């Protein structure tokens, strides 16, 4: 690698809005704030909600189906 052209790889602190602090390394060079992390993201905590589409697929198929065809 050429010397002097690559950014410095420094240790930074990523702080989540839930209070979790993660130490990592980055070329960014400054600490960052996160909205979600592995401790508070709904997918990882098991508190994920299922969004009910309420028959939207059936409504779409009804609107755009070709008349005279059956499955």
Swiss-Prot record:
Signal peptide: none annotated. Binds 1 zinc ion per subunit. Pfam families: Ribosomal_L31. InterPro entries: Ribosomal_bL28/bL31-like_sf, Ribosomal_bL31, Ribosomal_bL31_A, Ribosomal_bL31_sf. Its cofactor is Zn(2+). Keywords: Metal-binding, Ribonucleoprotein, Ribosomal protein, RNA-binding, rRNA-binding, Zinc. It comes from the Bacteria. GO terms for cellular component: ribonucleoprotein complex; ribosome. One of its GO terms (biological process) is translation. Zn(2+) binds at residues 16, 18, 37, 40. GO terms for molecular function: metal ion binding; rRNA binding; structural constituent of ribosome. Binds the 23S rRNA. Part of the 50S ribosomal subunit. PANTHER family: 50S RIBOSOMAL PROTEIN L31, CHLOROPLASTIC (PTHR33280), LARGE RIBOSOMAL SUBUNIT PROTEIN BL31A (PTHR33280:SF6). Belongs to the bacterial ribosomal protein bL31 family. Type A subfamily. This is Large ribosomal subunit protein bL31. It comes from Actinobacillus succinogenes (strain ATCC 55618 / DSM 22257 / CCUG 43843 / 130Z). The gene is rpmE.
């Amino acid at each position: 690698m050429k010397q002097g052209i690559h950014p410095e790889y420094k240790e930074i602190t990523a702080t989540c809005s839930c209070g979790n602090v993660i130490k990592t390394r980055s070329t960014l060079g400054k600490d960052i704030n996160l909205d979600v992390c592995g401790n508070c993201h709904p997918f990882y905590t098991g508190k994920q909600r299922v969004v009910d589409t309420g028959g939207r697929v059936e409504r779409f198929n009804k609107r755009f189906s070709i008349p005279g065809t059956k499955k």
